[in-house]
Amino acid sequence: MKPLDRIHEAAKALDRHIILPEGEDPRVAEAARRLLAAGLARVTLMGGPEIPGAGRIDPAGGPDLAELADHWHRMRAARGMTAERALTEMRDPIRQAAMRVRLGQADGTVGGAVATTADTVRAALQIIGKAPGAGIVSSFFLMLSCGPGAPVRGGMIFADCGLVIQPDARELAAIALSAADSCRRILAEEPRVALLSFSTAGSAEHPSLGRIREALALIRAAAPGLEVDGEMQFDAALDEAIRARKAPESPLTGRPNVFVFPDLADGNIGYKIAERLAGLTAIGPILQGLAKPANDLSRACSVKDIVNATAITAMQTK
């Protein structure tokens, strides 16, 4: 079974409740229909058409709007939030969906078909917040290589390709640990993590490599049982024969399923090269490190993108 098919089957079994806050967008409404038809999730739309089997909330006038606004007011009062402003801001469907997830009314939310990434991520950070023990909220792309003639088949996690611009050593370690956890949840595989660089096992020296080496030490201290190595060039990480020559002492066994890029520039360029030249399917960015799942879509997303992001959001609740 292909990785995405496994994810869909697992999402069906979980039967999670996901809020889609941009129900007025036709793509979101159609995605809700497909999610319900496939049994991938229970769905509530904010705004938009009435869809059989889906919940629907008017974000501007729901019966519990004042209660939600009161929660938001109390959360932000120390930062100058007034009751009037809290009520206005809680009419925003992205914020309101995040608050409903925070309060346990739904298991997760997927937005960004209309709203900007900045607005979607800000709502998740401010309202849902970080998971206990998470050093940083970051993101990953699920990369699927399943086409005919693909040299590598299966699913892989690429992180961070969408959020943290220039992580320091502690942030890079946190990204890697979150990505390893995402691998377990989404791919149902034990993670094998490669910290990518232009150097393999000390083949080059540059001040920037110290950050990766420090991150590796932090990861090993935090998760001594995790299979992880770096710094490592991509070819050495991917190809066991090359790795045996360049890094014969590497503890990695087999092909890594988690690739951690040193910064956002490398990660963003890398996933797009893999997608556009190698034909991999890229799903994301998926946020990781939040207390409860909330995810962002590209404003250029397709109905299929929304369906897949929702299935992955359901998987993040495990």
Curated annotation (Swiss-Prot):
Superkingdom classification of source: Bacteria
Subcellular location: Cytoplasm
Coiled coil: none
UniProt-listed GO biological process terms: acetyl-CoA biosynthetic process
Documented EC number(s): 2.3.1.8
Originating gene: pta
Pathway: Metabolic intermediate biosynthesis; acetyl-CoA biosynthesis; acetyl-CoA from acetate: step 2/2
Record-level Gene Ontology MF annotations: phosphate acetyltransferase activity
Organism of derivation: Paracoccus denitrificans
Major subcellular site: cytoplasm
Catalytic activity: acetyl-CoA + phosphate = acetyl phosphate + CoA
Name of the featured protein: Phosphate acetyltransferase
Keyword Acyltransferase belongs to the record: yes
Keyword set includes Cytoplasm: yes
